[in-house]
């Protein structure tokens, strides 16, 4: 197989939960570039949040917001941009407030919420630690009023709770305009930055996934999916891993993701799982 494009998730794949990047991962990325293979970052983060890493890795393309935005990074050209409508945002926000669920909204350069908590508090602390200010944090009094007045360009809404969110799936299933990803990392989402157990739903416009972003790049670059390699760890990586010619799951990945992978690494993320995958399939 002649690999022409390698797509990788960031958090939990190249970067571990402590925001550490194994040194060998940088060497592996250099190897990709030296072989003239396109390197694509696929992440749930917005471009404003991931830009520094994209620059650091010299990525050719970026799929951001789980597929809501695709950018040709070398030519600074936006290829795709999708957002949630005002009506759908109000639908989501009203529901969250009704059941006392935490909600925050991602625009392409802002995080909007009524209170920093859970994932958005984690992002704020990570950004503070990194000394980065690409993502602005906007605290509003009432998120529904803010949506009504300003109609922000939101690509993703995130609802969080300290217990299971599965009971709310049916509410979002009846809205054909939106789709959601249920994030559950080995039972509960917990790390060394926010010492609290919680789960979250990442809600975006319908038919938007990382894999759809790769399908677009497949057509844009005239590269068959069979000539692509995809690496990831969580449920929002599953389709791209399943549909790529070579799909790699890091050993830290969820069981569902490992079940569809061509290869599962022996090393953990902190030990250079990404580099292991690259070195196995690139001679």
Listing of model-derived features with the role each one plays in the protein:
Residues 1-5, 9, 22, 200-283:
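Mg2+-dependent phosphoryl-transfer enzymes with acidic/Ser/Thr/Gly-rich catalytic loops
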Residues 110-229:
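Conserved acidic, metal-coordinating active-site core of Asp-based
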Residues 26-34, 97, 173, 215-219, ...:
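Surface-exposed amphipathic alpha-helices with a cationic face
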Residues 18-129:
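Active-site phosphate-binding/coordination module
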């Amino acid at each position: 197989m002649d690999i022409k494009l390698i797509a990788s998730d960031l958090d939990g794949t190249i970067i571990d939960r402590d925001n550490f990047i194994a040194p060998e991962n940088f060497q592996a990325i250099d190897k990709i570039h030296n072989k003239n293979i396109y390197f694509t970052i696929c992440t749930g983060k917005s471009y404003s949040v991931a830009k520094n890493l994209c620059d650091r890795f010299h990525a050719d393309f970026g799929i951001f917001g789980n597929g809501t935005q695709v950018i040709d990074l070398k030519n600074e050209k936006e290829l795709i941009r999708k957002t949630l409508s005002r009506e759908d945002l109000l639908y989501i926000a009203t529901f969250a407030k009704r059941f006392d669920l935490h909600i925050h909204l991602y625009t392409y350069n802002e995080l909007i919420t009524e209170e920093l908590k859970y994932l958005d508090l984690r992002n704020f602390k990570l950004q503070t630690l990194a000394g980065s200010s690409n993502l602005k944090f906007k605290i509003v009094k009432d998120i529904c009023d803010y949506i009504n007045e300003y109609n922000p360009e939101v690509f993703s809404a995130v609802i969080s709770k300290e217990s299971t969110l599965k009971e709310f799936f049916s509410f979002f299933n009846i809205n054909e305009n939106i789709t959601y990803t249920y994030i559950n990392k080995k039972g509960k989402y917990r790390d060394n930055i926010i010492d609290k157990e919680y789960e979250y739903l990442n809600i975006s416009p319908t038919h938007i996934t990382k894999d759809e972003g790769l399908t677009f790049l497949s057509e844009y670059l005239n590269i068959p999916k069979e000539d692509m390699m995809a690496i990831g760890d969580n449920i929002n990586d599953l389709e791209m891993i399943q549909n790529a010619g070579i799909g790699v799951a890091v050993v830290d990945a969820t069981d569902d993701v490992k079940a569809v992978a061509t290869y599962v690494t022996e090393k953990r993320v902190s030990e250079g799982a990404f580099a292991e995958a690259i070195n196995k399939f690139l001679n």
